[in-house]
Structure formats: structure tokens, C-alpha cells
Amino acid sequence: MEKTIDLYVKKEGAARENCFSTIGEAIEAMERIAPVPEEIAAELEKGRIYPSPVYEVTPFVVHIGAGEYREKLVLSRPNVTFLGEGRDKTVLVFGDGANEIEEDGEKRGTFRTATLRIDTPDFTARHLTFQNDAGYGHTVGQALALYVDGDRCYFEDCAMLGSQDTLFDAPLPLDPVKPNGKGPGEHKPRIRGRHLYRNCFLQGDVDFIFGSGTAYFEECTIFSKKPGDRSPEDRDTSVYGYVTAASTHPEFPYGYVLHKCKLTSDCPKGSVYLGRPWKEWAKTVFLECELGEHIHPQGWLDWGKTHGHFYYGEYNSYGPGASPETRADFSHQLTREEAEQYSMEKVLEGWFGE
């Protein structure tokens, strides 16, 4: 395997070789220092998945110093690690919202708002925050902090902060989001990516963890925040949000699995659902999670989708929001044997993010 190259990003600017004042400058420098071989770049462009790790591509570790980096970034090179100084110290933030008008006169749309879009396999991030501070969804529209579209993407001790649609765990659904859509993944192959989020903090409103990826959330804290100054009366409903909105592809065996996570909120009691299906075949399972009182007794909403297609399940939920006897009749309370089928090893097919 190629020798790892270290790059450094400091707010005060370059103080040593391979040191930069912005993360974007560090990303651009990678291709000058060690270009991705042309044949591999061509295969990645087609959406092919390589065995882990991608031995032929020089790995980079970007050491990002404390501070706020107001940048909007796309990473399309594999074998890259972002290493911050602490998720409360190193913050990558931008503020694009879906309702804003682009130069072409059209709204930006959901999938062009991401503060960071990861369009490559084998990405790792530790000890930093990804944020979209555009504002609440009812004013600015959807606003992604993170768009993850690649296999073997690993996040440890990171925070994802936003409002509506904080984390897009890609790929997109099979059907186009809109005719002639301009989203960056609209015309790409829908390849199943495995993503692991370990000891992370995720915050948002509406349904802020969504997409078609295969994702395992291990010991994460998930905070459903009250959606600004919009009260239930404004929407003629007592529902404040949904934690997940999976759009799992029919041929993917797993969607989202949340294991030993803690769900918290400043929303009223019983006002947030565990999930609703963005598309027909959504799959989401909660295992041994602590549920706050904000979780709706029904747990799940069908969003008008066909019962028997999507799959929602829980195993050993606890806390004031755990209420197996009142859960929606289309959801499942798993046995121990059934829950074992959702182990990290099975869901991620032997890849653990290390």
C-alpha cells in the first residue's frame, strides 16, 4: 500500500510544508502531490466499487486545526481521512438552502446544498463537526450538512448539525428525484454504500437522516430539535418531526440500523416519529436504543406507502419513549434471534470502518 501523506490545515495559515489555511486548498493539493491513476479515476467516475482499501491510491490524512471553516466542499478522491482537534473545536460550516435561487434562475434544490459532499469510497472523519447553518426548513428549505455517497465511509466522534435534512446517507432513490434534475447524483449509478457512524451527535428537524444507503449508527446521540417558530397550529398537526426517512432500494438487504443510540429532543412529548418511508421499500431498525418522551407512541408513520413493502423494527427499546404495546401494527418488535441478523458484521458485511 502507498505511504500515507499528511496535510495540515490551520486558520492562521501555512507554517510548514503541506500546510494550508483552508480545507479546500488541502483537497486541491492532493492531486498535485499524488494524482489518482487515470485508470482508477475512470472507474471511480463510472461508480465502480473497489476492494478495501484502494491500494493503488495514495492515502492522505488532513489534520484540521481548531476553528470554524466556512467552506462548501466536494471530495471525490478515495483514501482520505479528515482528523479534527475535537468535534466542539473543528467546525466545517456553510449555509446553502434549497429555496435560494441560483444563477440559472432556478431554486438550488435539496441535493446541491451540502456543506460537504463525499463522492468517493474509503473516507474517514474523526473529531470534527459538519454543519449547515442556513436556517429552518420552513424558510430556507432543505439544507444538508453532509452528503455521503461512497462505500466504506466511517465517522467517529463527529457532529452533524442542521435543520431539515441534515444528513443525506446516499445513494438517491432509483427513480429520479425530478425530471432533468440537477442534483449531483441524479444520473449516477445507484451503488450501495456501507457507512458507519460511531459515537456521533446528529441534530435536525423534519426527517433529518434520509436516503438509500446502508448505514449503521453505533452509540450515537440523535437530537430532534424544535422546528423554529413554527408551532403545531401552523401546520394543523401535533407532529414535530421524524428521525429517519429511509428510501432503501428493494435489492438492498439492509437500510438504517441504530444500535445503542440515545434519542433526545426539545420537542413536546409524543411529537416525533422514529421514521417514515421516503420510498416504498424503506428499512430501518432500532436496537437497544434509549428513546426520550418526544417519541410518538405509535413510533412509525406509513406516509401512504404500501404495508408489507417497507420494514420497521425495534429490539429492546427503553426509556419514556419506548412503548411496544402502542406501536403501529405494521412495525415489528424483534426477538433476540431476529435482532442478531442486524449485527454490525452482517449489516456492513465484515467491514467495520477501521
Name each model feature, range by range.
Residues E2-E354:
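Sequence-level preference for short, compositionally simple segments enriched
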